[in-house]
Swiss-Prot record:
One of the GO biological process terms: cellular response to oxidative stress
Secreted found in the keyword field: no
Origin species: Idiomarina loihiensis (strain ATCC BAA-735 / DSM 15497 / L2-TR)
Family stated for the protein in its record: Belongs to the Fe(2+)-trafficking protein family.
Alphabetized InterPro entries for the sequence: Fe_traffick_prot_YggX, Fe_traffick_prot_YggX_sf
One MF term in the entry's GO annotations: iron ion binding
Keywords: Iron
Identification of the protein by name: Probable Fe(2+)-trafficking protein
């Protein structure tokens, strides 16, 4: 049986994550307030950020940058700026 959460990203009830995917308090907040769809959308943005900015996940500074981008995207509705990317027109 799937969990339902009020997704802070989409501002609606949606299917929640199956388990906590990120450590610590932030991970708990994501688990309780972010839907599977919002998390999947973030993973696409995260991959683009890592590739375009050539982030090294072994570097604490790069991990901190990515965490700030994730928080802004999931909870504040701020899309990350990715150089050279033009979103498709609806």
């Amino acid at each position: 049986m799937s969990r339902t959460v009020f997704c802070e990203h989409f501002q609606k009830e949606a299917e929640g994550l199956d388990f906590q995917l990120y450590p610590g308090e932030l991970g708990e907040r994501i688990f309780n307030h972010i839907s599977k769809d919002a998390w999947a959308e973030w993973q696409k943005k995260q991959t683009m950020l890592i590739n375009e900015k050539r982030l090294n996940m072994m570097d604490p500074t790069d991990r901190e940058f990515l965490e700030k981008q994730m928080t802004a995207f999931l909870f504040e509705g701020k899309a990350p700026e990715i150089e050279g990317y033009t979103p498709p027109e609806s």
